[in-house]
């Protein structure tokens, strides 16, 4: 019951708020109109059935008091005694409610962490099975008010699964692996930060969407976290999270007994190793009595693990589980285990097989407080993957799904990509174990196989940026993750509409516009990045950001496409290929084994086919590639105009922040489109039926302009430059000029310039028409955008700037002057002169 029809949602405009940084996220508690009658209908008192400041019930009272005041201008008193329901909000646990209030009223049934919310006129009851649940109920009530929803309700709700955690990949030096929102809020210079004020703000956000656990450090863990002084720092962090019902856990380095403890081994069967980990665990729980447990990445991507000593992964996990058992702690053991040195020359090699190969033989051998944490797909957070078959192969083992809020392969928060529709393709997938309904969401909850533990983990990676993730719009994914972890059957569109109202207000125009943009964003990104199950065609060897399809193949990482002159795709059939399809239960395996029953959107995941293979749509594979990439880029262009239509409805600071990123995405989507299409056009030799690929009548190639101080440069990968060539200044101390006479009909155009914005320099460019300045800009995207920068001319650094509504006469002289800086040689790719309504 998160949604309702907000009373004020039909207002055309609520007015523009003061500038906002985004720090409050969806907990802005922005003012909602509330007249005298409205004020009189609100409770005047808040009764918290616990006065201990570290109690989530106490926090609930403070949140309710602040929220009522900020949202509705209502001043409500807070007390911890009495139980009058007259014009009061009573918040507490079931036990406290029955004891203190001597309540004869029947309380509905709900599970641990669940709550009951009852709103009757001016009487509000918020009763949790635990103190954490009571806090969740308080946030639920405030969410309703903040959305203008004053409905009278009475319902109980319980979580889908007991584990609802977030993972942070924060390093001890303060950097964050795959983090795009600034440095760590936890660590700096090898120790825990002294200033942990952002941690409390993060705790509020997480608790408001019912997250109950956090791993604060990188899975590629540094053993120094286990030094006594850092354990003390972890206790400080845990003290901040505790009042919000969030338990803290840590990632461990398997070799810590050797690297930190000076033991000669880290064999999980060695008594000295077992004792060492037992002592570490004792020390941690002495400081953090409610510690959640450990997250372990072992024998993966160079990380140490038990197989070094011919022990199984279960042996390693159980060593930690037994140290945690007396304290009620949990081991989250990652299933992301594979060999990244396999040879593509062997047709039957397949990284996708690894999880089942490693873990299926161990089913039933993990202790009951071990949870195997499984990425949603068999590879690595790709734009589309089938559900991991490991979910269907662990009957006697607790499992959790691992999602990724941080957009490692999906635009790194510089592209708008709303992820829940992607996640729902996995959560709602029926694996048909034993020919019975076996939805992934029911497996991870423990319901399908009657397991005591299970749930959710998401790699989030917030940082010190005021937007938390590097983009205001990316916060919709964190919000939605919490919502889905509580109730995975929720509709993705309903969730984002709630987030929009809480983040940007009740203006119906804002809600409708952002809903459309959000729901179109993942399909658009899939279209211009990678289609038909081929994976995200990004540079897997470098930044995981821009296009580089060749990087998928010819190495041991196993994200292969097996693309050649005639054909493309992985043959994962049992009959001819890697036998991956056979890892699924029979009904699903049969669907994927047969090319006729394999969905088009996963065709190239399961089958190696000619480029001329016909899809169910009737198109060939290669023509689908061409069309989809154009369609996706065209959709991305519309995000700019849609957002601009909200200019007078959103505060200037957030408006400009989002606009900058959407303009960038519009340009970078064209970089993606052209790179992928040019690569496969060059590889296959098959022309685009619509004659778009390689044909750009509105472009002026930089290398074809008159150059002074600039020289041509062969870009690598070749497809990330129009006509495979850019221009750079002859030296880093030389100003370059590129000039051309424009042969376009007189009219008003958008003047676009594609260039490269490299890390390590901030070049400056000025554009002239007939010696009149049209505009200028600086290559400073590393200061503005969140994605991993590049030191090369490539698909990561390629970008576009557009000057709109430029009056151009046929025969005008265009001149671009570039001044290099640092290692950046003011590189240019091409100029495009676009008539109204044309997407280059």
Curated annotation (Swiss-Prot):
Known catalytic reactions: an alpha-D-glucuronoside + H2O = D-glucuronate + an alcohol
Main location: secreted
Listed InterPro entries: A-glucoronidase_C_sf (IPR037054), Glyco_hydro_67_aGlcAse (IPR011395), Glyco_hydro_67_aGlcAse_N (IPR005154), Glyco_hydro_67_C (IPR011099), Glyco_hydro_67_cat (IPR011100), Glycoside_hydrolase_SF (IPR017853), Hex-like_dom2 (IPR029018)
Segment forming the signal sequence: 1-19
Disulfide links within the chain: none
GO cellular component terms listed in the entry, alphabetical order: extracellular region
The keyword Chaperone belongs to this UniProt entry's keyword annotation: no
Domain of life: Eukaryota
EC number: 3.2.1.139
GO terms for biological process, alphabetical: xylan catabolic process
Keywords: Carbohydrate metabolism, Glycoprotein, Glycosidase, Hydrolase, Polysaccharide degradation, Secreted, Signal, Xylan degradation
GO molecular function, one term: alpha-glucuronidase activity
Compartment(s): Secreted
Glycosites: 50, 149, 222, 262, 279, 310, 465, 527, 576, 610, 682, 723, 732
Family: Belongs to the glycosyl hydrolase 67 family.
Function as written in the Swiss-Prot or TrEMBL entry: Alpha-glucuronidase involved in the hydrolysis of xylan, a major structural heterogeneous polysaccharide found in plant biomass representing the second most abundant polysaccharide in the biosphere, after cellulose. Releases 4-O-methylglucuronic acid from xylan.
Protein name: Probable alpha-glucuronidase A
Organism: Aspergillus fumigatus (strain ATCC MYA-4609 / CBS 101355 / FGSC A1100 / Af293)
């Amino acid at each position: 019951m998160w949604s309702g029809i907000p009373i004020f949602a039909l207002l055309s405009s609520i007015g523009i708020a003061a500038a906002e940084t985004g720090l409050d996220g969806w907990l802005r508690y922005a003012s909602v109109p509330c007249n005298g009658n409205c004020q009189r209908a609100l409770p005047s008192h808040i009764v918290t059935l616990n006065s201990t400041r570290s109690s989530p019930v106490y926090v609930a009272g403070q949140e309710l008091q602040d929220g009522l005041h900020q949202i509705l201008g209502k001043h409500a008193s807070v007390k911890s005694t009495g139980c009058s329901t007259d014009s009061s909000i009573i918040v507490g646990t079931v036990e406290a409610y029955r004891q203190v209030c001597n309540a004869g009223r029947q309380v509905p049934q709900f599970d641990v962490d669940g709550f009951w919310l009852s709103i009757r006129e001016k009487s509000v009851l918020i009763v949790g099975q635990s103190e954490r649940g009571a806090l969740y109920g308080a946030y639920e009530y405030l969410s309703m008010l903040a959305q203008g929803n004053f409905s009278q309700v009475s319902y109980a709700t319980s979580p889908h699964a007991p584990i609802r955690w977030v993972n942070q990949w924060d390093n001890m030096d303060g950097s964050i692996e795959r983090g795009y929102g600034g440095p760590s809020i936890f660590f700096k210079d090898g120790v825990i930060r002294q200033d942990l004020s952002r941690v409390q703000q993060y705790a509020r956000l997480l608790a408001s969407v019912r997250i109950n656990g956090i791993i604060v450090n990188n899975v590629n863990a540094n053993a120094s976290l286990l030094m006594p002084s850092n354990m003390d720092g972890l206790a400080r962090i845990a003290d901040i999270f505790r009042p919000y019902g969030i338990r803290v856990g840590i990632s461990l380095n398997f070799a810590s007994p050797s690297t930190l403890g000076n033991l000669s081994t880290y064999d999980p069967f060695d008594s000295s190793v077992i004792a060492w980990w037992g002592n570490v665990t004792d020390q941690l729980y002495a400081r953090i009595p409610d510690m959640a447990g450990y997250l372990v990445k072992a024998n993966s991507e160079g990380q140490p693990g038990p197989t070094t000593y011919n022990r199984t992964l279960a042996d390693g996990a159980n060593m930690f589980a037994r140290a945690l058992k007396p304290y009620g702690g949990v081991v989250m053991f990652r299933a992301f285990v594979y060999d990244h040195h396999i040879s593509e020359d062997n047709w039957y090699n397949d990284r996708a097989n690894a999880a089942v190969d490693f873990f299926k033989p161990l089913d039933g051998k993990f202790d009951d407080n071990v949870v195997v944490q499984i990425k949603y797909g068999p590879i690595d957070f790709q734009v589309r993957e089938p559900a991991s078959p490991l979910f269907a192969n662990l009957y006697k083992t607790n499992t959790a799904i691992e999602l990724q809020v941080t957009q490692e392969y999906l635009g790194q928060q510089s592209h708008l990509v709303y992820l829940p529709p992607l996640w729902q393709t996995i959560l709602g997938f029926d694996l048909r174990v034993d020919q019975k309904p076996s939805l992934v969401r029911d497996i991870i909850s423990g319901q399908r196989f009657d397991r005591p533990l299970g749930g959710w983990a998401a790699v989030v990676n917030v940082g010190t940026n005021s937007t938390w993730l590097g983009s205001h719009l990316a916060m919709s994914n964190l919000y939605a993750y919490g919502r889905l972890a509580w109730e995975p059957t929720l509709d993705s569109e309903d969730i984002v509409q709630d987030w929009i109202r809480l983040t940007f207000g009740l203006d119906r125009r804002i809600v409708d516009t952002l809903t459309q943009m959000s729901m179109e964003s993942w399909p658009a990104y899939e279209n211009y990045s990678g289609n038909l199950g081929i994976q995200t065609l990004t540079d897997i060897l470098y930044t995981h950001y821009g296009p580089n399809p060749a990087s998928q193949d010819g190495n041991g990482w196993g994200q292969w496409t097996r693309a050649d002159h005639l054909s493309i795709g992985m043959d994962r059939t049992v009959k001819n290929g890697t036998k991956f399809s056979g890892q699924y239960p029979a009904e699903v395996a049969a669907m994927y084994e047969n090319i006729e029953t394999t969905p088009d959107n996963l065709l190239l995941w399961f089958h190696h086919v000619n480029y001329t293979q016909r899809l169910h749509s009737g198109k060939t594979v290669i023509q689908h590639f061409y069309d989809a990439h154009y369609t996706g880029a065209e959709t991305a262009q519309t995000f700019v105009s849609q957002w601009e239509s909200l200019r007078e409805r959103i505060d200037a600071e957030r408006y400009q922040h989002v606009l900058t990123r959407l303009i960038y995405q519009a340009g970078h989507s064209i970089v993606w489109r052209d790179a992928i299409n040019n690569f496969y056009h060059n590889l296959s030799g098959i022309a685009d039926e619509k004659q778009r690929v390689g044909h750009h009548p509105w472009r002026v190639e930089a290398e074809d302009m008159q150059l002074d101080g600039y020289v041509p440069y062969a870009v690598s990968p070749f497809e990330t430059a129009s006509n495979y060539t850019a221009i750079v200044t002859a030296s880093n101390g030389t100003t370059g000029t590129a000039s051309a006479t424009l042969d376009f009909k007189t009219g008003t155009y958008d003047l676009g310039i594609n260039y490269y914005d490299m890390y390590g320099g901030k070049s400056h460019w000025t554009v002239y028409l007939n010696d009149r300045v049209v505009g200028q800009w600086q290559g400073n995207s590393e200061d503005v955008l969140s994605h991993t920068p590049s030191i090369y001319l490539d698909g990561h650094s390629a970008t576009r700037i557009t000057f709109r509504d430029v009056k151009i006469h046929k025969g005008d002289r265009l001149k671009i002057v570039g001044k290099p800086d640092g290692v950046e040689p003011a590189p240019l790719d091409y100029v495009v002169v676009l008539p109204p309504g044309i997407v280059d």
